[in-house]
Amino acid sequence: TVSIFGENGLSVSAALGRKAADFMETDLSPAPSCGRLFDMSAMGMLYRDELMRHVPYGVSDCAILSSDPMISAFINDCMRTTSNERALTLRINRRGTSLSAYTEKTGVVPFVKLIAICGMYELESGRDISVPYDSPAFLDDLARSYGRTAYRYLSAPSDGSDNVARRLAARQFWSRDALFTAAKLTCILEEKNMTFPELYSLLPPLFVYSTTAQLELPPDYLDEFEGENFSFGRDGANGFVLVEKRGKTHISPLGNGRFRLTAQSFDEETARELCAEAQAFISSGAK
């Protein structure tokens, strides 16, 4: 799988993605017909310099781990971690796209809640936030509670409808890059002079559960669905949303017959139940 990203690390338009895919499927050309070769190793230094601008000088009581030893060495070197006590452990996945936090008091805190913590800091500071289109709906509720807006950008836009969200996201690396999320989180802890459990306790209680499933019919088929005990309909360009008393479930088409279910509720068991019920509902074809 090849992922294509454009300016500021954001996903490219559907048209450009198709053009790049077509290019990669062409036959190999002899060396004389190729253009100039460029040494891209300097890109790593540019990334490092940008990350260094976002981290505090020396992070204490924090261990940052990754299943990729290169990521682990890189981020620890940039953030100059100084403690072996590991009051807070941050773990980055192999692709650098997700982050979790762990303390004895909080247990494991998933990436979406760390994004919410960073977003809450921005909102408290009087700034809007921008997140990927399939981010949980509670980020919109959180933004509204501060009188601000949570903009969303599409994964493969066909027009400029998400330009405002993309311009904002270009300055908020923490919303999509786990290394920058780790840096942002430690900066917030240092600025507020708080422990992670204290900071985490400020977040409104909410559990988010996400899974993917297969849909044999086109996504537009969901437009015809109706429910008796809940509301169901389109959520702008982001997919569909199913709302009932226990919580919300967002349904986002991913292409190739797959879709993502993201449920939010006040406890884990209910969120899992909402996902399972939504999957059964759309698979049944009931109207």
Predicted features by range, described:
Residues 1-88, 103-104:
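Gly/Ser/Thr-enriched, mixed-charge loops and adjacent short helices
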Residues 14, 18, 22, 26, ...:
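Residues on a specific face of well-ordered alpha-helices
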Residues 91:
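Conserved phosphate-donor
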Residues 94-97, 104-107, 111, 117, ...:
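Phosphate-binding and adjacent anionic-ligand microenvironments
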